[in-house]
């Protein structure tokens, strides 16, 4: 019984850690350790960062769709309804955030970037 409780507790801790949003500083620190070559895609750190960006993109995309469905003005309006981002552009944007603000989540950084990059026309 104690063993089961320990396993459940450990699983809950790991799940809670995974569910926390990564900060921009954490993202940049992890990205700096990844070599810029084809083998980078084989690294677990690379896959973790890709998943973080994918999750952030899905989150802000869902927020945009929810705002439209509710009749509110969305935070950003990309042409064609979708925005694509290259790895270099993303890293450049995250590196441009002042160190004092790098405690924001990657999701928040992307939200702000998309609002700046793809502003919605005034109604």
Please place each PLM-identified region on the residue numbering.
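Short N-proximal segments of mature Sec-exported proteins
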Residues: 22-92, 113
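Sec-dependent N-terminal signal peptides
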Residues: 4-13
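N-terminal signal peptide c-region/cleavage motif recognized by signal peptidases
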Residues: 14-18
């Amino acid at each position: 019984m104690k063993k089961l409780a320990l396993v459940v507790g450990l699983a809950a801790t790991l799940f809670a850690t995974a569910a926390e949003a990564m900060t921009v500083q954490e993202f940049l620190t992890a990205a700096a350790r990844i070599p810029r070559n084809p083998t980078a895609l084989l690294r677990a750190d690379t896959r973790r960062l890709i998943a973080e960006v994918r999750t952030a993109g899905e989150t802000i995309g869902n927020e945009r769709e929810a705002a439209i469905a509710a009749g509110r003005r969305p935070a950003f309006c990309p042409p064609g309804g979708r925005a694509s981002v290259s790895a270099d552009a993303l890293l450049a944007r995250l590196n441009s955030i002042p160190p004092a603000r790098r405690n924001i989540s990657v999701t928040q950084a992307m939200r702000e970037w998309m609002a700046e990059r793809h502003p919605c026309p005034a109604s």
